[in-house]
Design a protein with these regions (language model features):
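Non-catalytic interaction/Regulatory regions outside core domains
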Residues: 1-120
Length: 120
């Protein structure tokens, strides 16, 4: 398990829905919350992985365009779910999703992961 995934799972806040280490040719689901274990099929997870990794490739191009070498996190906010994508290396990342409401500690989680990522 990556250090970033460990940091997310150890974060003092809401329990993640899903945490996965995404590598350039495969992925490893590190955590699925108990109530969601039967919700996602292997096909769903593989499709999500392919979509996220294609986004990683375009994200690298976008970073060059804006003159930055890295970003701390990408976030997607849905009505009741927030998704984080923490880049860990070129074409590698950690995916984490949580139940979302206005009280979710978004900045605190990003800061904690950024601190940990800087220690590696």
């Amino acid at each position: 398990m990556s250090t970033i995934a460990e940091t997310i799972l150890d974060f003092d806040g809401p329990t993640p829905r899903v945490v996965a280490d995404l590598r350039n040719i495969n992925f490893e689901i590190e955590h699925v919350r108990d109530d969601l274990e039967e919700v996602y099929s292997d096909k769903d997870l593989e499709q999500a992985y392919q979509l996220i990794m294609s986004n990683q490739v375009t994200g690298d191009d976008f970073k060059k365009l804006v003159g930055r070498s890295r970003y701390n996190a990408q976030t997607l906010f849905f009505e009741d779910i927030v998704v984080f994508l923490f880049s860990s290396d070129r074409y590698e990342a950690v995916f984490a999703s949580f139940d979302y409401d206005g009280d979710f500690p978004v900045n605190e989680l990003v800061a904690r992961v950024s601190e940990t990522d800087g220690d590696e």
